[in-house]
A protein has these predicted regions:
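Bacterial N-terminal signal peptides that target proteins for export
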Residues: 1-11
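N-terminal soluble domains immediately following signal/targeting peptides that reside
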Residues: 23-160
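Bacterial N-terminal signal peptides
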Residues: 9-19
Length: 160
């Protein structure tokens, strides 16, 4: 049996180890996407995709998510702010189509400092997702998205 002084010392040591935990234990906000959307859930009718948002500090709200549709239509660069809809699932938001049928488009979706680039095919379906990141200890750390990354992705998409 531990004596009270040993127990207090052990508890204090454990507390100090926890309090001094390295920053790499923390994780940044993260985004993942669901597409195609369940066609049998009538509340999601018209949704192109679902955004799953996660943070270490709790469940994100709709005000935490932002985005834009970035496109090239008839050779002209376009940017359209996106609005997201809450769903019945916490931290999951629906995105309905808000951009033109013509041209090549990608979606820039952000949750705080994490940004994803979602590419769309010629039919408007999700064809890829990229969260630009650096890596630390084998894990991705989201980094800011440069305008040139959006432009080069659109240039490649419009060539197809």
């Amino acid at each position: 049996m531990l004596r009270p002084t040993r127990f207090a010392s052990l508890a204090a040591a454990l507390f100090m180890m926890t309090a001094a935990a390295p920053a790499h234990v923390k994780w940044p906000p993260w985004l993942s996407f669901e597409s195609p959307v369940n066609p049998y859930d009538r509340s999601l009718d018209g949704s192109v995709l679902l955004v799953h948002a996660a943070t270490r500090d709790g469940t994100p709200t709709i005000s935490d998510v932002s985005g834009s549709a970035e496109g090239i239509v008839n050779g002209v660069r376009r940017s359209i702010p996106l609005s997201f809809d809450a769903t019945s699932r916490p931290g999951v938001f629906a995105l309905r189509k808000q951009w033109a049928n013509e041209g090549s488009w990608l979606l820039r979706v952000s949750l705080h400092e994490t940004t994803a680039l979602v590419t769309l095919d010629a039919l408007g379906r999700v064809s890829g997702v990229n969260i630009p990141a650096t890596f630390a200890e084998g894990r991705p750390i989201p980094r800011p998205v440069a305008a040139r990354e959006i432009d080069s992705t659109l240039t490649v998409a419009s060539a197809h």
